[in-house]
């Protein structure tokens, strides 16, 4: 009986725990996003070798965000972070037109992985403040997102250094994950 009341109390008033995996190619802005969400400020970053993990509390949800390095030699290690992932944040440098096909290939590989079949997908179209940044519609097209079936996804325009779009993305993520 005590356990039942305790679990009910925690469901009503406690924070829901969510495991989020944040990936993307190198220099897309993953670590900048993580620490902007965590600390509310921009921190000086260096290329991530391995991972950073932080807890971000937002709207009564406690997101455990795993930021994994994106250099090509590190990407094979991404699979070690897939288990129990409820939300996948894929960060894309909207200004990097030369590597958009590489982004599409990596994203499609991940979406075929069985361990991620139930994870919702949030794409942060980062660096929207740059003059040649791809529009959301162009990025959606180049990444082939319209053809995704049986996958809940959303693209959010962001600028990590200014913080724009980040909380809107978390809003979408928290709304989708709270339905589960």
From Swiss-Prot:
<feature type="modified residue" description="Phosphoserine">
    <location>
        <position position="147"/>
    </location>
</feature>
<dbReference type="GO" id="GO:2000377">
    <property type="term" value="P:regulation of reactive oxygen species metabolic process"/>
</dbReference>
<dbReference type="GO" id="GO:0000139">
    <property type="term" value="C:Golgi membrane"/>
</dbReference>
<dbReference type="InterPro" id="IPR045872">
    <property type="entry name" value="Arf1-5-like"/>
</dbReference>
<dbReference type="InterPro" id="IPR005225">
    <property type="entry name" value="Small_GTP-bd"/>
</dbReference>
<dbReference type="GO" id="GO:0003924">
    <property type="term" value="F:GTPase activity"/>
</dbReference>
<dbReference type="GO" id="GO:0005737">
    <property type="term" value="C:cytoplasm"/>
</dbReference>
<keyword id="KW-0342">GTP-binding</keyword>
<feature type="lipid moiety-binding region" description="N-myristoyl glycine">
    <location>
        <position position="2"/>
    </location>
</feature>
<dbReference type="GO" id="GO:0060271">
    <property type="term" value="P:cilium assembly"/>
</dbReference>
<dbReference type="GO" id="GO:0061512">
    <property type="term" value="P:protein localization to cilium"/>
</dbReference>
<dbReference type="InterPro" id="IPR024156">
    <property type="entry name" value="Small_GTPase_ARF"/>
</dbReference>
<dbReference type="GO" id="GO:0045176">
    <property type="term" value="P:apical protein localization"/>
</dbReference>
<dbReference type="GO" id="GO:0043197">
    <property type="term" value="C:dendritic spine"/>
</dbReference>
<keyword id="KW-0449">Lipoprotein</keyword>
<dbReference type="InterPro" id="IPR006689">
    <property type="entry name" value="Small_GTPase_ARF/SAR"/>
</dbReference>
<keyword id="KW-0333">Golgi apparatus</keyword>
<dbReference type="GO" id="GO:1990583">
    <property type="term" value="F:phospholipase D activator activity"/>
</dbReference>
<dbReference type="GO" id="GO:0099175">
    <property type="term" value="P:regulation of postsynapse organization"/>
</dbReference>
<dbReference type="GO" id="GO:0048678">
    <property type="term" value="P:response to axon injury"/>
</dbReference>
<dbReference type="GO" id="GO:0032587">
    <property type="term" value="C:ruffle membrane"/>
</dbReference>
<dbReference type="GO" id="GO:0007612">
    <property type="term" value="P:learning"/>
</dbReference>
<keyword id="KW-0931">ER-Golgi transport</keyword>
<dbReference type="InterPro" id="IPR027417">
    <property type="entry name" value="P-loop_NTPase"/>
</dbReference>
<dbReference type="GO" id="GO:0060996">
    <property type="term" value="P:dendritic spine development"/>
</dbReference>
<dbReference type="GO" id="GO:0006890">
    <property type="term" value="P:retrograde vesicle-mediated transport, Golgi to endoplasmic reticulum"/>
</dbReference>
<dbReference type="GO" id="GO:0006886">
    <property type="term" value="P:intracellular protein transport"/>
</dbReference>
<comment type="subunit">
    <text>Forms a complex containing RAB11A, ASAP1, RAB3IP, RAP11FIP3 and ARF4; the complex promotes preciliary trafficking; the complex binds to RHO in photoreceptor cells and promotes RHO ciliary transport.</text>
</comment>
<keyword id="KW-0472">Membrane</keyword>
<dbReference type="GO" id="GO:0005154">
    <property type="term" value="F:epidermal growth factor receptor binding"/>
</dbReference>
<dbReference type="GO" id="GO:0016192">
    <property type="term" value="P:vesicle-mediated transport"/>
</dbReference>
<feature type="binding site">
    <location>
        <begin position="126"/>
        <end position="129"/>
    </location>
    <ligand>
        <name>GTP</name>
    </ligand>
</feature>
<dbReference type="GO" id="GO:0005525">
    <property type="term" value="F:GTP binding"/>
</dbReference>
<dbReference type="GO" id="GO:0043066">
    <property type="term" value="P:negative regulation of apoptotic process"/>
</dbReference>
<keyword id="KW-0813">Transport</keyword>
<protein>
    <recommendedName>
        <fullName>ADP-ribosylation factor 4</fullName>
    </recommendedName>
</protein>
<keyword id="KW-0653">Protein transport</keyword>
<dbReference type="Pfam" id="PF00025">
    <property type="entry name" value="Arf"/>
</dbReference>
<dbReference type="GO" id="GO:0098978">
    <property type="term" value="C:glutamatergic synapse"/>
</dbReference>
<dbReference type="GO" id="GO:0005085">
    <property type="term" value="F:guanyl-nucleotide exchange factor activity"/>
</dbReference>
<dbReference type="GO" id="GO:0045197">
    <property type="term" value="P:establishment or maintenance of epithelial cell apical/basal polarity"/>
</dbReference>
<comment type="similarity">
    <text>Belongs to the small GTPase superfamily. Arf family.</text>
</comment>
